[in-house]
Amino acid sequence: MKTVQDYIRTIVDFPHEGIMFRDVTTLFADPRGFRIAIDQMLHPYAGLQIDKVVGLEARGFILGGAIAHQLSKGFVPIRKKGKLPGKTISEAYTLEYGEAIVEIHDDAIQPGEKVLVVDDLLATGGTAEAGIKLIERLGGEIISTSFIIDLPDLGGRARLEAMGVEVNALCAYEGL
Protein backbone atom coordinates (compact mmCIF):
# COMPACT_ATOMS: atom_id res chain seq x y z
CA MET A 1 0.00 0.00 0.00
CA LYS A 2 1.25 3.48 -0.86
CA THR A 3 2.07 6.03 1.83
CA VAL A 4 1.41 9.76 1.73
CA GLN A 5 5.06 10.34 0.84
CA ASP A 6 4.68 8.17 -2.25
CA TYR A 7 2.26 10.76 -3.67
CA ILE A 8 4.46 13.81 -2.96
CA ARG A 9 6.69 14.98 -5.80
CA THR A 10 10.10 16.49 -5.07
CA ILE A 11 11.27 19.27 -7.39
CA VAL A 12 14.99 19.97 -7.16
CA ASP A 13 16.28 23.58 -7.11
CA PHE A 14 12.84 25.19 -6.85
CA PRO A 15 12.21 28.03 -6.18
CA HIS A 16 15.96 28.53 -5.67
CA GLU A 17 19.09 26.47 -6.14
CA GLY A 18 19.65 24.08 -3.25
CA ILE A 19 15.96 23.82 -2.32
CA MET A 20 14.11 20.50 -2.51
CA PHE A 21 10.50 21.63 -3.06
CA ARG A 22 7.94 19.14 -1.75
CA ASP A 23 4.99 19.41 -4.12
CA VAL A 24 1.72 18.20 -2.61
CA THR A 25 -0.35 19.00 -5.71
CA THR A 26 0.38 15.48 -6.96
CA LEU A 27 -1.08 14.15 -3.70
CA PHE A 28 -4.20 16.33 -4.11
CA ALA A 29 -4.63 15.22 -7.74
CA ASP A 30 -4.74 11.53 -6.87
CA PRO A 31 -8.08 10.49 -5.32
CA ARG A 32 -6.53 7.66 -3.29
CA GLY A 33 -3.63 9.78 -2.13
CA PHE A 34 -5.91 12.64 -1.14
CA ARG A 35 -8.23 10.26 0.75
CA ILE A 36 -5.28 8.70 2.60
CA ALA A 37 -3.98 12.13 3.61
CA ILE A 38 -7.35 13.40 4.86
CA ASP A 39 -8.07 10.17 6.76
CA GLN A 40 -4.63 10.22 8.39
CA MET A 41 -4.91 13.91 9.28
CA LEU A 42 -8.27 13.21 10.98
CA HIS A 43 -7.14 10.13 12.90
CA PRO A 44 -5.52 11.85 15.95
CA TYR A 45 -8.72 13.81 16.62
CA ALA A 46 -11.22 10.96 16.75
CA GLY A 47 -13.53 11.60 19.68
CA LEU A 48 -12.24 15.12 20.38
CA GLN A 49 -14.51 18.14 20.33
CA ILE A 50 -13.65 20.41 17.41
CA ASP A 51 -15.92 23.33 16.59
CA LYS A 52 -14.06 24.91 13.66
CA VAL A 53 -11.31 23.97 11.24
CA VAL A 54 -9.03 26.83 10.22
CA GLY A 55 -7.02 26.59 7.00
CA LEU A 56 -3.94 28.71 6.33
CA GLU A 57 -3.63 30.22 2.85
CA ALA A 58 -3.55 28.64 0.36
CA ARG A 59 -3.19 24.86 0.41
CA GLY A 60 -4.59 24.79 3.94
CA PHE A 61 -7.91 25.73 2.33
CA ILE A 62 -7.94 22.48 0.34
CA LEU A 63 -7.11 20.34 3.35
CA GLY A 64 -9.15 22.32 5.85
CA GLY A 65 -12.25 22.27 3.68
CA ALA A 66 -12.06 18.50 3.27
CA ILE A 67 -11.42 17.94 6.99
CA ALA A 68 -14.24 20.30 8.03
CA HIS A 69 -16.58 18.46 5.66
CA GLN A 70 -15.62 15.07 7.14
CA LEU A 71 -16.19 16.42 10.66
CA SER A 72 -19.40 18.29 9.69
CA LYS A 73 -17.87 21.46 11.15
CA GLY A 74 -17.37 24.98 9.86
CA PHE A 75 -14.31 26.04 7.91
CA VAL A 76 -12.55 29.37 8.46
CA PRO A 77 -9.83 30.74 6.15
CA ILE A 78 -6.85 32.75 7.33
CA ARG A 79 -5.76 34.85 4.36
CA LYS A 80 -3.09 37.26 3.30
CA LYS A 81 -3.83 40.89 4.10
CA GLY A 82 -6.44 42.52 1.89
CA LYS A 83 -8.06 39.31 0.60
CA LEU A 84 -11.02 39.05 3.01
CA PRO A 85 -14.00 41.40 2.68
CA GLY A 86 -15.59 42.93 5.76
CA LYS A 87 -14.15 43.46 9.22
CA THR A 88 -10.95 41.58 9.98
CA ILE A 89 -8.16 41.47 12.52
CA SER A 90 -4.58 41.03 11.41
CA GLU A 91 -1.26 39.68 12.65
CA ALA A 92 2.18 40.41 11.22
CA TYR A 93 4.99 37.88 11.13
CA THR A 94 8.57 37.90 9.94
CA LEU A 95 9.75 36.33 6.70
CA GLU A 96 13.32 35.67 5.66
CA TYR A 97 13.39 39.04 3.88
CA GLY A 98 10.68 41.24 5.35
CA GLU A 99 7.26 40.88 6.87
CA ALA A 100 3.88 39.44 5.95
CA ILE A 101 0.43 39.94 7.40
CA VAL A 102 -2.46 37.49 7.69
CA GLU A 103 -6.08 38.20 8.55
CA ILE A 104 -9.22 36.53 9.81
CA HIS A 105 -12.80 37.83 9.96
CA ASP A 106 -13.40 39.33 13.39
CA ASP A 107 -16.51 37.16 13.89
CA ALA A 108 -15.16 33.87 12.47
CA ILE A 109 -14.31 32.27 15.82
CA GLN A 110 -16.44 32.63 18.93
CA PRO A 111 -14.96 32.68 22.45
CA GLY A 112 -14.45 29.14 23.73
CA GLU A 113 -14.65 27.44 20.34
CA LYS A 114 -12.21 24.58 19.91
CA VAL A 115 -10.14 24.97 16.76
CA LEU A 116 -7.98 22.70 14.60
CA VAL A 117 -5.44 24.58 12.44
CA VAL A 118 -4.50 22.93 9.12
CA ASP A 119 -1.90 23.54 6.42
CA ASP A 120 0.12 21.48 3.98
CA LEU A 121 3.62 22.32 5.22
CA LEU A 122 5.29 23.34 8.47
CA ALA A 123 8.60 25.10 7.82
CA THR A 124 9.59 27.98 10.14
CA GLY A 125 6.14 28.12 11.72
CA GLY A 126 5.70 31.86 11.16
CA THR A 127 2.39 31.65 9.32
CA ALA A 128 0.99 29.07 11.74
CA GLU A 129 2.08 31.12 14.76
CA ALA A 130 0.41 34.25 13.35
CA GLY A 131 -2.76 32.27 12.64
CA ILE A 132 -2.80 30.81 16.14
CA LYS A 133 -2.42 34.30 17.63
CA LEU A 134 -5.40 35.52 15.59
CA ILE A 135 -7.57 32.62 16.76
CA GLU A 136 -6.55 33.17 20.38
CA ARG A 137 -7.29 36.91 20.11
CA LEU A 138 -10.85 35.98 19.12
CA GLY A 139 -11.11 33.68 22.15
CA GLY A 140 -10.67 30.37 20.34
CA GLU A 141 -8.89 27.43 21.93
CA ILE A 142 -6.32 25.64 19.77
CA ILE A 143 -6.88 21.89 19.96
CA SER A 144 -3.96 21.08 17.65
CA THR A 145 -2.25 21.83 14.37
CA SER A 146 -2.11 19.35 11.52
CA PHE A 147 0.22 19.33 8.51
CA ILE A 148 1.05 16.91 5.73
CA ILE A 149 4.77 17.76 5.82
CA ASP A 150 7.09 18.88 8.62
CA LEU A 151 10.52 20.30 7.75
CA PRO A 152 12.05 19.89 11.25
CA ASP A 153 15.39 21.50 10.37
CA LEU A 154 13.56 24.83 9.89
CA GLY A 155 12.28 24.87 13.48
CA GLY A 156 8.53 25.27 13.02
CA ARG A 157 7.55 22.35 15.25
CA ALA A 158 9.74 23.62 18.09
CA ARG A 159 8.33 27.13 17.64
CA LEU A 160 4.71 25.98 17.92
CA GLU A 161 5.40 23.53 20.74
CA ALA A 162 7.09 26.37 22.66
CA MET A 163 3.69 28.13 22.46
CA GLY A 164 2.09 25.05 24.05
CA VAL A 165 0.50 23.96 20.76
CA GLU A 166 0.34 20.31 19.71
CA VAL A 167 1.80 19.58 16.26
CA ASN A 168 0.88 16.60 14.08
CA ALA A 169 2.41 15.91 10.66
CA LEU A 170 2.02 12.93 8.36
CA CYS A 171 5.66 12.94 7.27
CA ALA A 172 8.94 14.79 7.70
CA TYR A 173 11.77 15.65 5.35
CA GLU A 174 15.23 16.55 6.62
CA GLY A 175 17.12 19.48 5.10
CA LEU A 176 15.71 22.25 2.96
Curated annotation (Swiss-Prot):
GO terms for molecular function: adenine phosphoribosyltransferase activity. It is an enzyme of class 2 (transferase). It catalyses: AMP + diphosphate = 5-phospho-alpha-D-ribose 1-diphosphate + adenine. InterPro entries: Ade_phspho_trans (IPR005764), Adenine_PRTase (IPR050120), PRibTrfase_dom (IPR000836), PRTase-like (IPR029057). One of its GO terms (biological process) is purine ribonucleoside salvage. Pathway: Purine metabolism; AMP biosynthesis via salvage pathway; AMP from adenine: step 1/1. Pfam families: Pribosyltran. Keywords: Cytoplasm, Glycosyltransferase, Purine salvage, Transferase. Its EC number is 2.4.2.7. GO terms for cellular component: cytoplasm. It is found in: Cytoplasm. Homodimer. Belongs to the purine/pyrimidine phosphoribosyltransferase family. Catalyzes a salvage reaction resulting in the formation of AMP, that is energically less costly than de novo synthesis. PANTHER family: ADENINE PHOSPHORIBOSYLTRANSFERASE (PTHR11776), PHOSPHORIBOSYLTRANSFERASE DOMAIN-CONTAINING PROTEIN (PTHR11776:SF7). This is Adenine phosphoribosyltransferase. It comes from Roseobacter denitrificans (strain ATCC 33942 / OCh 114) (Erythrobacter sp. (strain OCh 114)).
